Structure formats: C-alpha cells, structure tokens
C-alpha cells in the first residue's frame, strides 16, 4: 500500500511535511522542527484556538513618546542576532563587494530615467516656492547638507536646548535612524552638536521706519487707533474685562472651520460593536499570518521591546485631596456654582440691555477693523517700485535701542507735573473768592457743632450729600483745631484721580504749594515731603502702610471718605481700624458717607458712635426720566448731549459711560454729529477714565480754550470726590462696570451691570456742585424703582478673596473667620481662598504665613503669578518668567482684522512654540526686543504695539520689586524645559489630561476642557498627555487659555497635595498608611501652633491691660513720635 502511494507522489528535495504548517515560537537552542498535530491534518483546531486566544487579548495603545537607551540596546541585540545568523555556514565573498556596494549606493542616490520614485505615466506637478508660510515649506529645507542659504523668514529663532534635540532623536518619529549605519549616525550627531542656531530675523539697522500715511486724516486715524489700547492694564485691579477676552476677536466661523478641519483629519468612520469585533479579528488574523510567514519576524521582537519600555516609562497619576488641619475639615471643594450677580432680576430690561451692550459701539468696532485691515497699496516705501524710484522709508521714531529698564515707567502716571492752577469757569467761582466759596458750603454753617462732636468721640460718622464740602473742609478744620501738631491727618479716597484733585483743591484753598503742607500718595507717585501735614491717599496706600506699622502711630486723625462705595480695601481697613481704635485712645476716626446708611457704620464700631448730618444741598437739580426704555444707551446719550449743546443754556456737560470703548465711541459720535451741522457752536469733548494718561486726565480740570463748552465723558470715576467747575448738565445711562468673581474660571470679570439707586443719586448730585443743574436719566422712573438695587453690593462679597486673605495674614490676623467684616464674605469663599494659598505654599500646615507667602504679598499680582515669579528665581529662569508674567498682565497682543485673517494667522505661526502658549508670548517679546521695540515691526506682524509697551512698563515695575526682595534675575538661555516646569509649579491645580482626540478633562474635577483653535498646541499633530492652563474661557465650549504641556512627574513633584505617582511595588494598604502618617504629622504641627498662639494671646492681653502702655499724655504743641515720616512706595 505504501509503495502504491509512493508511485503517484512527487518526492520533494527535503524531508519536510507538506500542507499548511503552523510553526511554534522558536526556543533558544531548539532547532527541532514542529511536529504536525494528529487531531487535524491541516491543524485547523490549533489555528482556531490561537485565534480565540488572540481575540480575548486586549489591545493597548502604545502612547510612549520616546525611545530610550534600553530600547536602543534591544534593537542592537536584534541586529547582532541577525548578523550572527547570517555568518553561519558557507558564504561566497568577492573582493569587489565593497566597490559594488558603493556603486549601488550612488545609483540609488542619483535618480535615473529607468528607476526612481516618480510616476512616469502621469504629469509632474510643478512646485512653487512660497517662503512666507511654514505649511508650504519643505520639512528639511533648512537642514539639508551643504546648504549655505539662510533660514526662511517664517522660521523665527525658537531656542532649543540640547535636551530638546536629544529627546527628538529618541522619539518614535526617528526610529528609522536606528537602521542607518553607525557612521551615518555619528556624522549626523556631530553636525547637530556643532550647528549654531541661526537668527532668521531680518536686520533692523535699516528698518527704522514709521508707517507712512497718504494724508493727515489717515495719520489721525492711526493715532486714534493707537489710543484705544492706552492704559488698559492700569487700575483694572487684576480684573478680566470682557472687551479684552483673548478669544473675543476670533470669529465663530474661524473656530468652526478649524475644528471641522481637525475633525476631518482625525475622525474615523463609526462602526457598530459587531463590525469593530470583526475588524479586530481580521487584523489579528492578518498579523498572525504575516508573522508565521516570516515577513515581519523582526517586528514581533521589536514590539516586545517597545511593550517592555512602555510598561517601564508609563506614569500613572493618582488624584488625592489632602486637607490641612487648620481648616478643620470645613473646606468645600465644589465652589459656588454661579457668580454673585448684582442685579435685581437678570431678565429685566436694564439687565438685558447691559448684557447685550451698545449696537453703536459694535458697529463702530467693525468699521475700525475694516479700516485697519485695508491694505495701503499707495505706499511705495519698502516696495520694489519704491526701491527703483528711490523712495526711502521714514525713520521709525518709536524704535528704542535702549534696554527694558531705561525708561521711567512711572512718568506717565504722575500728576504733579501736569497739574496747573485751576481756572474759574462758572459764575459762582469767578465772582467769589476762595474764602467766600468755603463759607458758602453747607458744612461751614455747622462747623462748630461738628468739631465738638469729634473732640468728644474717637469715632464719628458724618453724613453729607454730594457737594456739602466734607471732603475738602474736614481735614482743614482738624488742622485748625490742632490735630496736626501730634501727627498726620490722613484722608483716604477710593480712586487715584479723586485723591489728586482734592489735594490740589485743598492746597489752593490753604495757599500752599502742592507737596508741602498738603500732599497726596497714589500708585507710582508720592507727592509728600517732611512738611506734609494733610495727606490724601488711596485706601490701598493706607492698607500697605499697615504692613509696616500696624498701629498707624504717625497719624493723629484718619478720615475714611466716600465709605458708602464699600470697596474691597475699604472693608478691610474698617476691620483693621476697629482694632487700632481699641488700642489707641488718641486716634480720631471720621467716616464720611454721602448716603443715609450711617446706622450700619455706627453698629459696626460698637453702636455708641454718634452720627452727624450736614444739612442742605448746595444748588437744586432738576430731574428728567426717559418716557420709554432706551434700546441703545450710547446713541441716546449722544443725541441728548447734542440737544443740550444746541440749546440756549450755558454750562458744561458730564456724561457717564460704563467703559473705555463706550467713552471713545461716544466722543467720536458727538464730534461727527456736530460736524454734520452747519455753524454749530464749538464743543470740547474730553474723555476721562482710569487708564487714560495723567496729562490727558488733568485737562478736564483746566479751562477750555476760547471759553467753549466742555463735554466730559467719564466712567463712575466722576461719581464721587471729583468736582469739575462748571458742570450743570448730567446724562446718566444707568450702567457701570463692576468686578464679579466667577469661581468657574477662578478669577474676577469686569462686566456691565445697572447701577444702584444710591449711585444714581450720586450722579445726580454732580449737576448741583457749582450752580442749579439738570440731570437726564436714560431710563424710566419705573425702572429706577423696580430694576435698580437700593445700594451697591459690597465688593468683598463679589470678588476673589485670595489677595485679601494673603494681606490679612501678613498683617498678623490669625483667625480670618473671626475677623470683623462689616459684611462678611461667604465662608465657603474664604475657606477656598485659604486652601488655594495653602496649595501654593503661601500658608503652612498651621495656617501661618510662610516666607514665600511674605514675598508674595509684595507683588501686586494674583497669588499664582507671584508664586511663578518666586519659583523662577530658585529654578534659574527668572528673566524668562518675568517676561511671561508681564505678557499675561496685559490684554491680547495679537489681532485679526477682518478680511485679512489668513495673513494674520500666517504671521502668528512664526512665533508659535508647539509646547506652550506661554513660551509663544516669550518668543514674541524676544523678537520685538531684537527689532529694537519697533512699532512698524508690530504692525507688519499684526501685534498691538501699545500692549507690548505696557509689557515693558509692567516688566520694569516687577523687576524693581524683585530687586527689593533680593531675588536674582537669571536667564537660562535656550533651556525652555525649565521654564515649562516653573509654569507647572504655579498652575498645577489647573492640570488637564488627554481624554480623546483634541479633548482634555481636568484632572481633579473632570470638567471637559478643549484647546482653542488659536492655541499653539491646536492641530500640531501631537497631543501631550498632560497640560496646565492659565484659565478657562466660557464661550461655546470650555476653552483653555494659555496652555503649556507638562510631564506627569512634574505634577506629582510640584503638587503633592493633589497628585502622586502610583508605584508598582506599593500596595493599596501601604498608600493608605502613608496618607495617614501625613495627616498625623500635620495634626501634630497644628497642636504645637495652637499652644504657641494661646501663649502669645495671653501675653498680648496682659500688655493691653497695663495702663501705662495703653494711655499717653500728649501736651499741646508737642511733636509726637507719630509725626516721624516714613518712606512710602505705592501699590
């Protein structure tokens, strides 16, 4: 039988079995062939079991981003194994083998007509070089061997350190380099090490040109546009303005277009669960067949190496919540869901109008954007035709070759050099002398009674309507009564302009020079001297003085003026002064208010405080309300102002507006309306807001040229303590901007809200200061009664309390929950602020201020930015971080004009650093500094030159504070990984991890976060696993703003209270025991701190009970130690 089978069978050349053979995985040292299974002739049962085994296995994505040294060693072992296998047996070797190999290599490098990669059957696409955009560049254009050309103009010099280059060579994208010859790798590495970074920025020696203009009208438009960004960051008190939302200028169409492109690039066809299972099984079957056939034998060995490396380098972040013992478990991690909105009803007419804004402002903004986007083809300077004709560019007067700190950033905010003698405008001021004007004020009639009350009581509440004279006269009465002999007479004002103007007026009434007997102290300016007796200042300045002198020994009397505004600093000062009054019986505290809420102030100071009311108003004011609700408050205010101006009555006009953009639009519309009329009388339109330069602010107090009428357009800065001579007409739209803390984004937001009834009455009183006036309210009488709050919500109840907590801790307040606030903030907000400061390292485990916290108090920044600056000095990158913090303190520096969005985006691509938006800001500033701070360079690259100038000023100010704190200014060169780690040290609490393609989630809260299309990380083709962001902007999605890629290890190192790394050796029990030991250690520290606090409290109580330390006898005419002048620096 066997012989018959042999006769009909063709014998093979070797003793191998035929048919489908499934080989087992080779075992080292075993060369025995695999025996076929006896159960199935073709081995189908084994194949089916193998298939089921693979089907049960779960595929894991290889997220490893780098090839480390261990992987390279594994690859080299594979190469050695294959070389050893090839050396076995007998081989034929020719002497001409090397020569032929060189010949073959040269043939491969030089494409011939017969062989190559190009398709000969079709037409070749011509290649056009467009060197302006990186998307149209060849990827290796600047790195080709033997190329002597300069880098392209788009490739800005983004510094890269040796660490970055090495990390890229070890990444998955360079795995093919492992298969090159050793000589090729050595040569490439040598070229990389000795390659010098070339600066692709054009030389700026020739480029010192100012934008040319066709006529004077165009120059005026350009100058007007530059004013729009003037003083945007001063005095906004760290608030986020909706007008300067970094994503506000980005159109919805652009966002949808970029996101659609990204989805089309990354979106996969949707499959059902059954289809996915079938597809997965087919892939496993194909891979198995390829592996068995020997085609991809090495891929299996390499994949095993990568799997081992993935398991080795994969970092798992564990989220935890450690609560310090001083909070006693009272922390609430879910912050307040909705911000406190200071309106009666969010659906009322005025609230809806405030949220919608002005239509006239929106239309004018669009027109300005179109003008800005207009390409000026008539300009010949710098063009090819202009070069042929010899037209040269004008010298750029804005270019500044000096260093960052060469200019005096304080000059533009100092009022003393711009203040002139006030000239009388109204008949009342021109006909009466200063003495007669003082005696005409209502406060003069009750002067003696008021001073008797002040002498008999330490705390007095004085209520007087606007214009009664309490601000200017009260300090002079105290001086005349002898209070200036034993110390200073201080008077606080809520705003800088108010402090400056009142000091100017009091100096004129006393007949002394400003800065001598009467002076003022505001931010960036201290206009006082050794002779100063009456000192006007902002409430923030007095709060800062409490840091150095908790008892305020240099003051004999303090006047808290305009206390009804209830600013944040005012409420904190009330709590501190209450403690000071209890310790000092010789200190007089006078609280003045223009509203009838004196009982609240009296109850706060013990209930025994007398209340003195100044009767009467200076001049009557006629009140007019709108008949119907107004749709556009800007357009209505402009029409009313033109109507008043064209009427027969004399007197200046005061118009209230919410913000800077509304003010600028109102001024321009008034000028346009009057320009359309024939023979219209002249009108001087003057804006005033806190961001305006001091020289322009001072113009409102001066007489208009030619005696023409003035129309002053102001924010609520003109509500209190600001007397402009000649104001007889007031136009009140009924809106203002207020800071409201939004816990979701973690910062304050400046938004437009309806004013309160008390503020409306204050605005009405502005018309009756120097004569009978009229007030036009652009809202109905019903809206005044039903849609306006009785009084303004205190700022302390609607703002971020982190800076307040930090300041109170620096003042020695141990238990903040027991601190005396007139209107205590929500306890949850206070506890959350304390918890945030503890996570930043400003508070220790016992709730006391740390050395880092004391340094953070000195910076007028958010605590997070202060932490970043302090950590940068320790990490050796303070110069770079100082620039980044300064860039974050100003509005958006990029702009996208309509019609030229793509060109602006292409320019922006030059500056983007793929790992970080923060580093992109740093790169922009470095390039601007390289171009000698040129304004033309900013215009060419679609950058706001005014915003960058403010960055220089902020940087100089912060640098001065760092020098005072002995923090070194160090630059780390091109090692920007250290900068990213420093950013992570401050924003680790805003960390997000990758969830899907283009989608992140907050590591702690799970809130979805998305990259905005304008981010440098959007669409770069590589999504980092972890990022930190500056803030969340709530628009169509929860977009992250200012994103930086970080490593997971950094989060665990810099934020141990939130994150920890899971180690394979640690069990769950060991992790729990470790957390218990941490809590026990903190509780032991808290017990020791409580004992120390009790001991200090007992000592302070004993010292307070001693009569010799609590009372002092002061002789009349003697100088006290409190009169010693201390050097003061502003906020």
Swiss-Prot record:
PROSITE patterns xrefs: DEAH_ATP_HELICASE (PS00690), HELICASE_ATP_BIND_1 (PS51192), HELICASE_CTER (PS51194)
Basic and acidic residues bias: start-end ranges: 1-12, 65-122, 139-148, 160-173, 180-225, 407-416, 1085-1114, 1121-1131
Source taxon at top rank: Eukaryota
Catalytic activity from the UniProt record: ATP + H2O = ADP + phosphate + H(+)
Keyword hit for ATP-binding: yes
Entry EC no(s): 3.6.4.13
Matches recorded under InterPro entries: DEAD-box_helicase_OB_fold, DEAD/DEAH_box_helicase_dom, DNA/RNA_helicase_DEAH_CS, HA2_WH, Helicase-assoc_dom, Helicase_ATP-bd, Helicase_C-like, P-loop_NTPase
Annotated S-S bridges: none
Residues reported in the UniProt entry to bind ATP: 464-471
Region annotated Disordered, chain positions: 1-225, 389-416, 1085-1131
Motif DEAH box: chain residues: 561-564
Domain Helicase C-terminal: 629-812
SUPFAM superfamilies xref list: P-loop containing nucleoside triphosphate hydrolases
Protein name in the entry: Probable pre-mRNA-splicing factor ATP-dependent RNA helicase mog-1
Species of the source: Caenorhabditis elegans
